[in-house]
Amino acid sequence: MNSAYHSPDMSQRIPGPAYSSSAPPPPIHTYQQHQHPPPPLPPPSQHHHSSHPPLPPPPSAPHPHHQHPPPPPPSHSLSSHQHHSQPPHHQSQLPPYAPAPYQQPQPSQYPRPHPHQQHAPSPSQHDEPPPPPPFSGPSPTDHQKDSEYVPPSYSKIEEGSGWKYSLDVKQQPVRARMCGFGDKDRRPITPPPCVRLVIINTETGKEVDYNSLDHAMFVLSVDLWNHDGTKEVNLVRSSTGTGAMASSSTYTYSSLEPGTPSYQQQSLPPSRESGYGQSQGLNYGQDYPPPVQQSYGQAPSYPPSSSYGPPQQYYPRHSGYSAEPSAPPPGAPFRNGYGQDQNALTRMAVVGGQPQGMFTRNLIGSLAASAFRLEDTEGQSGIWFVLQDLSVRTEGTFRLRFSFVNVGRPGGQGTNVNQGRAPILSSCYSESFHVYSAKKFPGVCESTPLSKKFANQGIKIPIRKDANIKGEGDEEMYDQN
């Protein structure tokens, strides 16, 4: 009886602990399915004997969990497992862990299981940086190639003779000191550009005999271009009327062509009659004539203290100017270059003492050169153009463009001059050179062997003395030959 009585008790006790041990799993699964109530239950499930006492805290614990239902279920399952792993070590700290789920910035705790997921995207992030290095590598080299780009040269076969002309710049310009807008202080480009003319007979494919060639009608012209060789900058306009240039801006001849009719409008009588009285209200002084206003409308106004004084002499009486619109203007005021033709204005721009805002040449000096038969440093005879008298008014980086023209008759001999148009048979650009201000100018270049060779043959090239090579004295010590 007793054994039979104990058997049911043991059967009841055995299932009891078994049921108690099996009871925790259902709440775990229910916790995984239902996110709100379970958090307090799992810790008691792990502690078999303490499962009943911690039941009072659960009512307070579910509230934080009710506050944090938004996180995804897998995250709660992970957090639940973490809570299951933490409480066994601290049984008395179950209530403090209740706020811990409230601080579910458990990204700090999640990275422990997720490091594998974080390391997975990291290679993708490390895969992105590799593309930039190859892209950044060639880019600077490409920019350098673009900066070193030299415009292509041009050559043409002359009709009648069948000769092909080309230019070869043997001596490139390097640097120069800006000469400003005065005509007294001239600073030539150093070293002087030396261009060799190459003539090839298309029938034989060889160069012609330069010793028997008549080069009297060969002319080389020069103009100034920007650093890239994409735009000519032959004209410059100063923003001040003083000798020292405060600022300047370069222009091209083509950019001024649309404004040419404004020069012809100067001589219209109606503009003079009404324009002179209105000029006072247009920030022009009473002593300044309207033709200047019309032809240089974009220029800043002339201050009363300006050194531009000729109009004061040409227009002593204001009433006389408006009463006789035709007589005074063609007489006095236009004799200094304010003529009706555009060429007079161009000549006036070259002459010094111009008012502020007037256009003038940026490249000055001998802009055309005749050909010479000279021997180079190797003793070979050839046709050369030496441009030793070139100066630039403004500071910057420029190029020179050389254009060759044969002004003689095609196929003619002697001094037959072409009365028509002479086509450009060849052109080329020099390398870029820099024009420095007076303070930044490092000094003139030393005389090259080619310059000395040409100077010994009678070409007037400034040759630097040997005593000045070491820097003694100033740069004006030359042998002009």
Curated annotation (Swiss-Prot):
The keyword Transferase does not apply. Its main location: nucleus. Residues 1-157, 241-339 are annotated as: Disordered. PROSITE patterns: VELVET. It is found in: Nucleus; Cytoplasm. Residues 36-45, 53-62, 96-112 have a biased composition (Pro residues). Belongs to the velvet family. VelB subfamily. Component of the velvet transcription factor complex that controls sexual/asexual developmental ratio in response to light, promoting sexual development in the darkness while stimulating asexual sporulation under illumination. The velvet complex acts as a global regulator for secondary metabolite gene expression. Component of the velB-VosA heterodimeric complex that plays a dual role in activating genes associated with spore maturation and repressing certain development-associated genes. This is Velvet complex subunit B.
